[in-house]
C-alpha cells in the first residue's frame, strides 16, 4: 500500500481539528501523521490507527511524546473511549472500478469508507465526544445522512471549502443527546 501524501483535504481538516481540545483523541487512518501532530498539541494523549503497517512505521519516528500508534482497521482493536475522533477517510467514488488506490478510493459511491469508519468510531466515542471528518460533494452524502439518523447521531457542518472540481465539507458528528 502506498502512503497517502497530505493534500488540500488533509490541511483543511487539520486546520479545523486544531480548535478542539481535551483528554484523549484518536485519529483513524493516520497516514503521514499531520493531523495527529495537530491533535497532540491540544490533547493529553493521542492515538493513531492505520490499517497499513508501513504507514505507521514511516510516521513512528515523528510520533509525539503523548502519542501511540496501533495497526488495525479503523478503531477495531481499541477498547478505551475518546473525547475526540478525527479521520480523513478516502472519499472519491470508484463507480467505474478502475481506481485501486485505497488511500483515495472511498468505495462505489465514495462514502463507504466513511460509513465504515463511523460505525467503528462510535463504539469508542465518549457520550459527549465529537467526531470530525471530511466529505466531498462528489460522494453520495445521502447515505451518510441515513446512517446518522439510524444511529441516533447528529451532524453539523463546521466549514466548507470550494475547489475547482468539488466542494469539501468538514462535518462534526456526535450523539444526539439532550
What are these model-derived regions, one by one?
Residues 1-6:
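Class I SAM-dependent methyltransferase Rossmann-like catalytic core
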Residues 42, 101-104, 149-150:
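Glycine-rich, phosphate-binding/catalytic loops in enzymes
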Residues 8-87, 93-94:
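Conserved SAM/SAH cofactor-binding pocket of Class I
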Residues 15, 113-170:
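Conserved Class I SAM-dependent methyltransferase catalytic core
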Residues 171-178:
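C-terminal lobe and adjacent flexible extensions of AdoMet/dcAdoMet transferase-like proteins
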Residues 60-61, 97-100, 144-146:
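Short amphipathic alpha-helical segments
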Residues 29, 49, 107, 133-134:
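Active-site-adjacent beta-strand anchor residues
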Residues 89-116:
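Mobile active-site "lid"/loop adjacent to the S-adenosyl-L-methionine
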Amino acid at each position: 500500500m502506498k502512503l497517502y501524501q497530505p493534500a488540500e483535504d488533509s490541511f483543511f481538516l487539520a486546520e479545523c481539528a486544531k480548535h478542539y481540545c481535551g483528554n484523549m483523541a484518536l485519529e483513524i487512518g493516520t497516514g503521514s501523521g499531520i493531523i495527529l501532530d495537530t491533535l497532540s498539541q491540544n490533547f493529553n494523549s493521542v492515538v493513531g490507527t492505520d490499517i497499513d503497517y508501513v504507514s505507521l512505521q514511516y510516521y513512528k519516528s515523528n510520533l509525539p511524546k503523548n502519542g501511540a500508534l496501533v495497526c488495525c482497521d479503523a478503531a477495531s482493536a481499541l477498547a478505551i473511549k475518546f473525547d475526540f475522533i478525527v479521520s480523513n477517510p478516502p472519499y472519491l467514488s470508484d463507480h467505474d472500478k478502475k481506481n485501486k488506490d485505497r488511500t483515495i478510493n472511498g468505495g462505489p459511491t465514495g462514502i463507504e469508507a466513511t460509513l465504515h469508519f463511523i460505525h467503528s468510531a462510535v463504539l469508542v466515542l465518549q457520550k459527549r465526544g465529537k467526531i470530525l471528518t471530511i466529505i466531498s460533494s462528489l460522494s453520495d452524502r445521502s447515505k451518510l445522512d441515513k446512517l446518522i439518523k439510524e444511529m441516533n447521531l447528529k451532524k453539523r457542518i463546521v466549514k466548507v471549502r470550494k475547489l475547482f472540481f468539488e466542494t469539501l465539507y468538514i462535518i462534526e458528528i456526535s450523539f444526539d443527546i439532550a
